[in-house]
Amino acid sequence: MKHVNVLLAGGASRRFGEPKAFVKWKGRMLYECAKEALGEQTVIISRPEFIDRFQENGENEVYQDAEPFQGMGPLAGIYTAFKKTDGDLYTVLSCDTPLIQRRTMLELKRLMIAGADAVVPISDGQVQPLIAIYHKRIMPVLYDQLSEKRLRISDLLGRISVCYVQAENIGANPAEFININTRDDFSCLEEKSNSLKRD
């Protein structure tokens, strides 16, 4: 089966105050830190106003949300990746998860079993649907939800066959799953990063 890596970078970053994808941490943009966990061949889904900025940074495969679902959140981003690329399994990652490790993403990919539509980790009791693997066969379900403007990803998970994985069972540190939504989250990055080094 053909595998596609997808980085979602289309959020408005309202709570953060500026586009999170391009915020520098330890000399790299946050999206670059997340992308490292996916590998070199990565498709980026973003907002129209960010496309040029990604391309100026050397990213070649960058798309905006497919019509008619522009600006409709992560589900639109996943749908767009399905529509724009030729793949079967899609590793999906949000750009504001800079501490996620490549080994964790590879373990999730390894755990995709026959018949499952998705592999989704759970860390500290929290389901992590934007650090996950999805099969393209869910595309009609995605289309229906987007058409109905049902944008909660939890609704999607309730309609497909999901293999849930406890993060500790694949050797993942809870710190990997930090999601940068606010400046306070960003200020905690160093501490969380240090806990990864001690692991």
UniProtKB/Swiss-Prot annotation:
Question: Mind telling me which Gene3D superfamilies this protein's record contains?
Answer: Spore Coat Polysaccharide Biosynthesis Protein SpsA, Chain A
Q: Which reaction does this enzyme catalyse, per its entry?
A: Mo-molybdopterin + GTP + H(+) = Mo-molybdopterin guanine dinucleotide + diphosphate
Name of the protein in its database record:
Probable molybdenum cofactor guanylyltransferase
Cofactor list: Mg(2+)
Instruction: Specify which residues bind GTP according to the UniProt entry for this protein.
Output: 8-10, 20, 65, 96
A GO term for molecular function: nucleotidyltransferase activity
Question: How would you classify this enzyme at the top EC level?
Answer: transferase
A GO CC term? cytoplasm
EC annotation from Swiss-Prot or TrEMBL:
2.7.7.77
Q: Which InterPro entries match?
A: MobA-like_NTP_Trfase (IPR025877), Molybde_CF_guanTrfase (IPR013482), Nucleotide-diphossugar_trans (IPR029044)
Residues that hold Mg(2+) according to the record: 96
Tell me a GO biological process for this protein.
Mo-molybdopterin cofactor biosynthetic process
Q: Which family does it belong to?
A: Belongs to the MobA family.
Pfam families referenced in this protein's UniProt entry, alphabetically:
NTP_transf_3
Which PANTHER family does this entry report, sorted A to Z? MOLYBDENUM COFACTOR GUANYLYLTRANSFERASE
What functional role does this protein have?
A: Transfers a GMP moiety from GTP to Mo-molybdopterin (Mo-MPT) cofactor (Moco or molybdenum cofactor) to form Mo-molybdopterin guanine dinucleotide (Mo-MGD) cofactor.
What does the UniProt keyword field contain?
Cytoplasm, GTP-binding, Magnesium, Metal-binding, Molybdenum cofactor biosynthesis, Nucleotide-binding, Transferase
Q: What is known of its domains?
A: The N-terminal domain determines nucleotide recognition and specific binding, while the C-terminal domain determines the specific binding to the target protein.
**Subcellular location, record wording:** Cytoplasm
Q: Which organism is it from?
A: Bacillus subtilis (strain 168)
